């Protein structure tokens, strides 16, 4: 046995006590002896837990506050830093993101393409691939991206963002982004961690806004998935997106004539080539009777299924759903990170959390803006008195020996006016008065100064009203988002209750029964003999 390790028998011989659970905590190596010794069980137990925790918290599972995985958050943060209104090369965005994400350019590039294909946060230019056909995006040096207007409206605000040091300590990155929208439910997510996974289906933009408004009003709401690929969905067992639920998604199939079926939309997660292959394989196995499959997909999905002579199109339709990728079952698993731990929630709980978070962020923004306006009002009042009273022209001020003496004199002259100010006058305020240029003093107009002060007071009053009615203000926010962006996101997936298709009956219906009366044979392969029934 190697000198580098000892097993449990040797450990017991050395009279090292073993805990009741049979595991040892990992201990530093014993460097007193010539050989380095580790205790295997403790080492692997601790290291595996560290690895599992890292993958769960830092790689695969989204955070409930902003609905983003770390790599997505870092991409958006980098794009905001690069943002000047113009498109940036994806290769440049990937390189910039590597300042914050230590896992290489490939993972960043793939995550960026997935974000772009969801058509919500990123405005894309160039060949970004096709989720319908499964075609990949062009090389990063050929495609460009910038933040969408929606992302700029709802995702960023440095004043309400909590920051942390990046992995190498050279930069700051957001702990979570201040997203004022249920982004996690709009985009959906899929991630496989160690010991758990997360699969949240995407939902409709307008329905999310309506649900948030209903929640704020204390009304009931229901949310069901909506997919970019369209199709139809049976949500009777959705179970609010919780573990154990399931949805069935079907392709949209139209009957052109008795001999031809047309597939116009494919199920979520499937591609046109994949659906075509599944139909061909089902045909080869004798599950369905078709003559050929023709893929005419370009901008829109168009798959023509040409039926064999004498085959019923209605029965073939059922067989396509039963034996091909024209129908798929999806099991959601709503797992998110909250307070540095994974939690399994319902879709409704996620929306409520996101809506509460939005309300909190809007309140913070109002309070920050109010504080800035109060500072502006305070200094505008100081400036008005400083210039109107011509304090800067007084002999004692002009003969001040130094800045401290000048500040002391100004403070003394302002003392009678203290009741007019909204807060105490500080030395920093007086130093700002000393920084006023003569050109500004010469252009001073009392009426304009009074108008400016009145306008600031009016804005403060408006903010106070919003803070007093913060729920109504948040409802108006969601309504604004719906009015501004909702037309781009109509529901694409039809909600339906599917009839149960029994595979055995469908196969039987696709078989024809023949009989050879002379030889006494009966079966489905005697196609030259007398036809009896389907």
Model-based region annotation:
Residues 2-244, 304:
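Catalytic phosphate-handling regions of large nucleic-acid enzymes and associated NTPases
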Residues 2-24, 31-35, 40, 189-192, ...:
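C-terminal interaction appendages of subunits in large macromolecular complexes
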